[in-house]
UniProtKB/Swiss-Prot annotation:
The organism's place on the tree of life at top rank: Archaea
Protein name per UniProt: Uncharacterized motility-related protein HVO_2248
Organism: Haloferax volcanii (strain ATCC 29605 / DSM 3757 / JCM 8879 / NBRC 14742 / NCIMB 2012 / VKM B-1768 / DS2) (Halobacterium volcanii)
Region feature (Disordered): 233-261
Coiled coil: none
Disruption phenotype: Cells having transposon insertions in this gene are hypermotile.
């Protein structure tokens, strides 16, 4: 399996400049989408709680969030392709199949693989964007070089510092790191509310209130320094001219390029 995953990860075209467009044909579909977004908001709050708890290591909070995202991608793979999703993704990757199911499975499987790698690989930024339109939503799984954006909150883990410090400065660094984690926890907790505001329930809002919404987020790590960011994104109302009746891959929208220009540091590269 490890050999297959290395081969799969070598195909940078799987994610690059692409997104998954999923139809929202009725209120039941909207409710499911809303539920998924509320799960993301809840995960933000759980991460904030863990960061604010001095008895929980920063790495544990970081890995818990990564594992949660990876599990969601695995569920998507199974929903699209069944239990043989890995075989289907690999078949698409090597050119043995060229169909919609194969393309979607390969997309989410690549995202799954990269999320699993981020537990041990640093200096790689997770930079997704989720957009709601009147009849559909899009998910663009992005990764970029580096570990932060121009608007990220930074916080440190003294357990991951390789510096040799004397006792006095080590205690000061430890306390400053805990303070940075508490500051980050407050920021991350606020981002959960942004998600809830951008994607309201179909049972508690009018169609006009919920037909457009969007967020982009970013998370990264470099050594002992971790970063988080989440902000609203204004969807382009002219992005799609034709409806869609099943999930499919589409080119990324103008919103993706705009957020890259606004948020990625100079020299950063979308992977």
């Amino acid at each position: 399996m490890s050999e297959q995953r290395v081969t799969f990860n070598g195909d940078t075209r799987v994610l690059y400049r692409q997104a998954v467009r999923t139809p929202l044909p009725n209120e039941d579909a909207e409710r499911l989408f809303h539920e998924n977004m509320m799960n993301i908001a809840d995960a933000q709050e759980r991460k904030a709680d863990m960061l604010a708890d001095p008895d929980i290591s920063l790495l544990e909070a970081y890995e818990t969030q990564l594992e949660g995202i990876a599990k969601s991608y695995k569920r998507r793979c199974r929903h699209i392709a069944g239990d043989d999703y890995e075989e289907i993704a690999m078949a698409y990757n090597r050119g043995a199949r060229d169909d919609r199911v194969g393309a979607l499975t390969a997309y989410y499987f690549e995202g799954l693989w990269r999320m699993q790698q981020r537990i041990t690989v640093t200096d790689m930024l997770f930079f997704p964007i989720i957009l709601r339109y009147p009849d559909c939503f899009t998910v663009n799984i992005r990764f970029a070089s580096g570990h932060t954006t121009t608007e990220s909150v930074l916080y440190e883990s003294p357990e991951h510092s390789t510096e040799e410090l004397d006792d006095e400065y080590a205690e000061r660094y430890y306390n400053e790191s805990l303070y940075s984690q508490k500051e980050a926890a407050e920021y991350i907790r606020d981002t959960a509310e942004i998600i809830r505001e951008e994607f309201p329930s179909p049972d508690e809002s009018t169609f006009e209130e919920r037909q457009y919404g969007g967020i982009t987020s970013a998370g990264g790590r470099k050594g002992p320094v971790f970063s988080s960011m989440l902000k609203r994104v204004e969807p382009d109302p002219n992005r799609f001219s034709e409806p869609v009746d099943q999930p499919t891959l589409v080119e990324e929208g103008k919103e993706a390029r705009r957020t890259e220009r606004e948020l990625l540091p100079e020299g950063a590269i979308v992977l």
